[in-house]
Structures are given as structure tokens and as C-alpha cells.
Amino acid sequence: MALIRHCVTLLLILCCSRLCGAIQWLGLTVNGSRVAWNESEHCRLLDGLVPEQSQLCKRNLELMQSVVNAAKQAKLTCQMTFSDMRWNCSSVENAPNFTPDLSKGTRESAFVYALASATISHTIARACASGELPTCSCGATPAEVPGTGFRWGGCGDNLHYGLNMGSAFVDAPMKSSKSGGTQATKMINLHNNAVGRQVLMDSLETKCKCHGVSGSCSVKTCWKGLQDLPHIANELKSKYLGATKVIHRQTGTRRQLVPRELDIRPVRESELVYLVSSPDYCAKNPKLGSYGTQDRVCNKTSVGSDSCNLMCCGRGYNAYTETIVERCQCKYYWCCYVMCKKCERTVERYVCK
């Protein structure tokens, strides 16, 4: 019996590693930052890459520093975006070894997949424009005719290249015939990856710089650039809040994802989807991937998700005072510096019981 339990445990671990394989690369922040990325052998030595991604790594070594940067940005942006929620994305720091909140097809994993997918393409697209990559350059000049008073110029983000390379990297584990995991899980992961990239594409906007005597802006040079990651993450957060729970069922001659509650319609390409309902994240429960909200900072005057009532799940909160030092009474002196005094201020903080 002990041997059987051991084998079952190993199978579950293997299955979990495949289920969340497409975001294991977020673990590259642990050891990828110390790699010079000048030898293909580095690719197989790193935690966080499944075999298909290791092959892509070997063929595209010059991209890997951008991939590491994307992993850092995705983890940081996720935690900033959810800092006011019970689930605050802190578990993403465990990459490449995830807890159930990110390994079981939850609403939270849907967000992280989408954000990671958008971030890697965003980072590569901007690396092209900044001249960091030898294999790409500025984005193509838009085909649309420029409007009155501006011309196309500058160096736009290379979204086309970013999407191609980013999708190849994050989608590889689900498209491999050798990968484990259920067909339903592969489908929702690919779907949520695509949602992330679509939000990224929708963020492409025209950016301009003025030219003219004394800043008159008689002529503007414009290019296509992506909005910053916090904007993209907030768009995805809105989709997270309205995500659709789905089931995998036979529809005609093939199996499809359909909304569990509204299975009369297909899943929309623009919505995040998930398979497993999440806990309320109020109490610590490692089996569910919940860290709980004890000792979390809350906002006494807020009526949102960071309010002490919601954040603390009705358990109440403790108050304490803290003295902070900040700049004050600043004066500008010609030319050209600012001098400030240092002032102390006492603030009241609140933490959940």
C-alpha cells in the first residue's frame, strides 16, 4: 500500500507539473538571471523550462534575457494588480513549483496564464524597438495614411515579432503530443494565453512626439506603441472578475469548452475561462493554495476589496501607529535644484486578525 501511495503521489506531481507547464518559465527569475545565455547547454540546466521550451531556447538564445525579464515583470505586475485582493498573487513567487491556486485550472490561474502570455510578447516587442535583440528591429510602418499634421516615424514596438516568438514559447507545452494533462486543461490554457495576447494587441496605440519652433508642435512624428503592462493587467483583471466557468463536453463531432451555466452558447474568444471554483482565500489552507488574510493590511475607510470588512473576512482587525519620514517644505532654487526638509508624520495602519 505504501508503494502504491508513493506511485500515486509521483503521478500527481508529474501531472501537476504538466498542467502548469506553460507558466513554469516564470521560475527563470530564480536562476535565469545568472546565466550568460551564450551556450545552448544552459537551456537544459534551468528549472522552469519544459523540453519543448528548451528546444526553443537553444534555437533562440538571444531571446532568453528578454524571457527572463518578462518573467520578472509578469510576477511583479500580477502582485501589484492584486495587492488589494484576498488572493494577492504571492504564490507566483513559488515558480516553477506552484500551489493548487495556480495548478488546478482556477480563475486565478486563468489570469496568470493570460498575463504571462501578454507579458512575454510585450517584453520582446519592446526589446526589438530598443535595439536589444539582433534578430529584430522596429515595428513595420503602419499602412494607414497619416492624418493631417503628423507623419509616421520613430521606432514602434515590434508587436508582430513579439507575438510570434511569445506564443511559440508559452503555447509549446500544450501543443506537444508528449505533454500530459487533460485535453480540457490544455484547451483552457491555450484559450487564456490567446486572451492575454488579444488584450495586448488591443493596447497598441498611436504615440507622437512634437516638432517645431519653441515646442509649437507644427509637425508630429508618430509611431505605434504598446501601453504599459499595468494597463494591460488591469484589463485582464476585469476579465478575471467576469471569468466564465466551463465544462468540456461533446458538441457534434468534437469536444468543446462550453459555459457551465449557459451551455447554450460557445465560449467567447474575449473571456477568460476556468474549470475549478476557487476558495474564498480567507483562511490558510495549503491544500487549496490559500495563504489566508491574517496579518494582511486593510483599508478602514474603503468600500472595495481592500476594505477591512472584506479583506479580513469579518474577523476584525488590529490598529497600530507608525511614524514615517518624508520630504516636506520643498523649495526650488534658481538654477536648478530643489531643497526639502525632512518631516515626521504619524499614520494609523490596520491589519487583519
Swiss-Prot record:
One of its GO terms (cellular component) is extracellular region. GO terms for biological process: gastrulation; Wnt signaling pathway. PROSITE patterns: WNT1 (PS00246). The keyword Hydrolase does not apply. Pfam families: wnt. Its main location: secreted. Glycosylation is required for protein secretion. Palmitoleoylation is required for efficient binding to frizzled receptors. Depalmitoleoylation leads to Wnt signaling pathway inhibition. Disulfide bonds join 78-89, 128-136, 138-155, 208-222, 210-217, 282-313, 298-308, 312-352, 328-343, 330-340, 335-336. GO terms for molecular function: signaling receptor binding. A lipid is attached at residue 214 (O-palmitoleoyl serine). InterPro entries: Wnt (IPR005817), Wnt_C (IPR043158), Wnt_CS (IPR018161). Homodimer. Secreted homodimers form a complex with wnt5a homodimers; tyrosine sulfation of both wnt11 and wnt5a by tpst1 is required for this interaction. Interacts with the transmembrane receptor fzd7/fz7. Interacts with lrp6 and ryk. Interacts with tdgf1/frl1. Interacts weakly with frzb1 and strongly with frzb2/crescent. Interaction with frzb2/crescent antagonizes wnt11 function in the neuroectoderm, but enhances it in mesodermal tissue. Xenopus and other lower vertebrates contain duplicated wnt11 genes (wnt11 and wnt11b) resulting from an ancient gene duplication event, but the second copy has since been lost in mammals. In addition, X.tropicalis has two very similar wnt11b genes suggesting a further recent duplication event. Belongs to the Wnt family. This is Protein Wnt-11b-2. The gene is wnt11b-2.
